């Protein structure tokens, strides 16, 4: 056995009344107990009850002191929100693996103040109140929860848009905030991840949008334009970034080489961590490709400059016209770490005959000149762009705005293989750009040193090459010549890394060799990211690399091994098919009037696309289908005074060694939808008995007993006993285990809890008529028969008869018709009620049997855990050292469950003492 495992005398599985009793009995005998509960609080089902029968004592008043004693006992360790993965029997012990699910709240920091709950915008059905009312996604399970710690109910998935973003931005979060009119909060949420929302709102290719579930219907939510709206709204309000003081300074200095999206984002996150950051930029202006090559009509430079203020307002220095040629020099200047984010500022050339003719330029030179005002005069010229990527399309649309008579993009593969994003191609064609496919230039022809013609050859596609695209193959004899005045080569970009080749290792394509997980170079102080590592990518991909690098650089500077940490808090994307199967989805068309008229926009470099109005932004945000349980809007983070919210938490596997195991996993309730003839789930005024217990409990969700359908106070209530028990005809495999197809035994408690509820309803609704439909009344315990007779004396009606079905009246009242056989007369009758309560039976909860890896935990004929010697040693099971308590062994009321727990604790103590 490994020495680093946690060692206990006993493992108690389940934190209901039986589990607590067993744990306390053992703990009081000075045994160390590990209590594992799958819910967020101990208490089990008893804490949901109104009162207990037959004494009608308050259930919470009985169980909450026991909950407090259990939670505070020095010999009891609680593991909540946890599941048993495996239990493996050894010679004199058990090895246990436990999976503790994340709360996304630091349990040792949370004060239970509920501030997170107050600001959380998302409401979900409240399990504690049996889905009769709502609760927030950030919530404390119930008012009497113990421990009183909040939890963020993410349910293990994120929205597809969040999962898809390479930068870790939370589109669902800011969409929901825009929907609520919280534009500043939307901006702040974006700034938690990436500091250049203005640029992304205009020039991001929005991978989030391509994964939007709404896209499977009429069209995706216009996520990028929503971002553009709130970022511009914020920048209009704050034209200059507010200076943010970082109070905790580390004293570490980091040099960032390059001020593109990767460098800016890395500098931003490092500065937030308290490090001193200086960016070295070789160009005259900061911003990298954002500033130098993206056309003004797509991304105005004022937007880039305002984005950069988000970084410099943290104290980050940017030194332009400063080309770094030696990395060792930075170390000698006192920098503790270096981040290389040089981008891809070199271009590939065709290198064919005539390439040196005047009138042939690279795409980057062409776009840079256009951005700095040194624009080529293309008036009435015929322009060709060679290539099919994003820069090729940018160059083609720029050429149109510079007066070109005809602009043609020539690409050697088919349109499907063009690497440019499809919307950009469509916009270019709308403006008049011609796309010529399956052509390749083989010779430039000129006169007097100036380009005049291009010789092309036609291509066909063959088998896929290393890129996964079909290889273009020349067609013999297909050469032809076209007139041209100006050619822009846009056949690819390559990293600007050659200058560092003597100090760091490069791949053959010029990209930097890094640790793929940490972006560290050979375990040194140097890290690299962005296009210099990945090759040409998108803005958001490069920014995501910068964010990742900052995370690992911070670990390195804190003396930690970066390899020991996992970056990011993404969860798997929710299954879209489940979202699309919802019955409340309506169609909502997007806003299509998004562009300036074509004849206007091709004449200048002003914005092509319009910014949403506030009404348009909200309308677009309303189209969101709310895919995941948690919006990840991080309002809880902002509101928490204790800074306890932690979205980076992950599942934790805990190893334990225990000497004995007590199974007190309780029971399941029959799912009444498996008796469809009773209308549960179809008629809102048909509820189950646990829901009624919540309606009459002191901690009930409403101030009165109300029927769910319309909030009316019911005055004619029916109970149908034995719903899902004493019934061999039900296929209820969904509610039970795969082996359980019916539930022929009596659940023992249904009659009495129904009579209890009837008496409480007589007190809460003195004028109500209450009828209990039954086959037999099982009043077997002490005082139970008297309790039954008392209820009859109070006016509760009892009808001995089997209910066949429940239907709803068609008069709009929501009232219900019960069709039943009155066994006293043998006549089939009907009765009207305005609320029907199904007294559901108890089913075995035997899931724990699957967790024993090398032993078989036997079940009895009804699929409860088998008691080997029910009369002499009622807690013994088929595995030595494993004991059963409470309703895990069969139906029991609360007193019997407590007695059973005492028996299990006693037998476990005897077993432990004899080891």
Mark where each language-model region is.
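FAD-site-proximal beta/loop scaffold in flavoenzymes
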Residues: 122, 126-149, 356-381, 464-536, ...
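Non-heme iron-sulfur electron-transfer modules
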Residues: 39-65, 79-109, 121-160, 169-199, ...
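A conserved FAD-binding loop/helix module that cradles the flavin
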Residues: 532-557, 662, 741-752, 885-913
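A short, basic/flexible loop-to-alpha-helix module at the beginning of a structural domain
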Residues: 1-8, 147-153, 234-254, 365-381, ...
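Short, well-ordered coil/turn residues at beta-beta hairpins
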Residues: 341-342, 386, 490-491, 522-523, ...
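A Rossmann-like FAD-binding core segment of flavoenzymes
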Residues: 65-106, 300-349, 361-379, 401-509, ...
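Phosphate-coordination loops involved in phosphoryl transfer and adenosine-cofactor binding
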Residues: 7-9, 81, 250-253, 321, ...
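Beta1-alpha1 glycine-rich phosphate/pyrophosphate-binding loop at the start
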Residues: 8-72, 137, 166-180, 187-194, ...
